[in-house]
Amino acid sequence: CGEGDLQSTLESCYQNLETNQGSSKYLPDSFNGRLAGILSGDVAINPHFSDWTRIIFMYCDGAMYQGHKAAPVSYKSTDLYFRGQNITQERFNWLNAKYAINTNATDIILAGSDDGAIGALLWANHLQDAVKGKVRVIADSGVLLDVVNPTTKRPHFQDAYINIMKLSNVEVGTPCAECNTKYPTERWRCLFFENLYATVKQSMFVVDSLYDEESFGISLGVDCIDSFGTLDLCNATEKASIEGYKSGVVNLLNKATAISGNGAWAPACVTRGGLLTKPTWTDNTFQTPMNSGYTIEKSVNNWFLGVAEPEKYKHVDTVSWPNNAPCSGVTTLQRSLMTE
């Protein structure tokens, strides 16, 4: 729930209290029939992972599944609790008590989308130290660049992460001891993928859009993308800003995938978030490269199996919009599925 200033951050956390991101009271009684993508139990949709034990860690306090503050923060006569580290650790303890994952699990995929992507990366080393099986990480839509918004003249996400740390991390560091050591006085940096990925010891797979419309709006102040996911309404200055940001994401993904065992799937398509758990998982409209047959599902499976040829699981689009044509002018129906 981080925002550009501390007051806005508190307000955002407060607003989350009455949503499923802030309280289990608003969660459905069952997720049966609600899960898609890599979480689906349908073998036709999820042929390689549908028979796995799938556990969902719902969000609680808006601090990326980490941080701890013993005393609540009072805001608008309401107590806000920031205890993501203890909550996540207790979930791991519960999994071990119920499934004996510390000794029985041979393969574990720790995956997350958006803030959950950073949460998965932060906890990966800790989880691997606790279990005998092999831990792998999938980070979906978690690559946000530390840049200055030209409209506000402020680095939005840097400000937001500093505020999160002020609220939740005065008493503890992040779950990633290696990143804490790397940035002892600026631990907020560990909430950025660009600073975190190299400290993760496990094999990781990164899923992201090279044209993340929400990032453009928040980081760049660009709000020209139309309802069909095109840049047709953007002027030359806006397109140049978008392409500059996209180049930064490409460079970062290329660095991350240069590490042995790491993979990626990043199309030159305009979309946003949760690509692992939406119809985009197997949708042939979304392939990287275009018409290559490499959907997210196929690329992730090749990475998981450890195929020898990296070109089968390292797919960062080399073109710009709209040159991955099938996903550059999607229909209204497809668009509604992508943004649900």
What does each model-found stretch correspond to?
Residues C1-E340:
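C-terminal His-loop and adjacent cap/lid subdomain of alpha/beta-hydrolase
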